[in-house]
UniProtKB/Swiss-Prot annotation:
InterPro entries: UPF0251, WH-like_DNA-bd_sf. This is UPF0251 protein Spea_3639. Signal peptide: none annotated. It comes from the Bacteria. Belongs to the UPF0251 family. It holds the Pfam family DUF134.
């Protein structure tokens, strides 16, 4: 049995729910789900260029967990882009 998911601090808002290849209906595509914490890790680590230690502290998780989330997110994005799959983005409620 796996451990229960820890509540994590998520700060960004996702502008879209689906990212897919142009010209192909989403019903014809395989879909990969990007989880909210993976999206946040990708945003903090790659877009905002935060160190893993700082980003992990902001999310309230360990640096190792942050590294796992970032690696998982990168793999999912790379798979979707290189294999022409749809990427389902998480719906994160805006806290404003």
């Amino acid at each position: 049995m796996s451990r229960p998911k820890k509540c994590r601090h998520l700060s960004c808002c996702v502008p879209y729910s689906l990212f897919k290849p142009n010209g192909i209906p989403s019903t014809q595509l395989e879909k990969i789900q990007l989880e909210a914490d993976e999206f946040e890790a990708l945003n903090l680590g790659d877009v905002q260029k935060m160190s893993q230690l700082d980003a992990a502290a902001l999310m309230g998780i360990s640096r190792q967990t942050f590294g796992y989330l970032l690696a998982s997110a990168r793999k999912k994005v790379a798979t979707a882009v290189t294999q022409g799959q749809a990427l389902l983005l998480p719906q994160i409620a805006n806290k404003d």
